Amino acid sequence: MPYPELMKPLDLGFTMLKNRALMGSMHVGLEEVENGFERMAAFYAERARGEVGLIVTGGISPNERGRPMPWGAKLTTEEEADHHRIVTAAVHAEGGKIALQILHFGRYAYHPTWSRPRPSRRRSPPSPPTP
């Protein structure tokens, strides 16, 4: 193996990774669909089973105003936390670790009502709504 350290455990002090392989954050689009968290749990568990030591989830908004769309995933209630626990448990069952990426979409976030002052009327390419 050309990278002998890659598959060795890594002690982070607060947790031990089974190896140094990291799956970077990507939005899989399952957070917002029916049974999405169960499907996401299976998706990430398969990666953990395939020797990924640490998985970073796609971005989850920390509040209502930080979501990219009205239906965008957020983590603000105990019920929403329970959905994420399904994913965490599935990854841990396969010996992997998972980190939730907290992501406020900032100027690209969806805002149903724009108050003054507001940005220009020009639409930003990543964000469909126009203020």
Give residue ranges: language-model regions:
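N-terminal capping/small domains of soluble enzymes
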Residues: 1-105, 112
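Non-globular sequence segments
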Residues: 92, 103-131
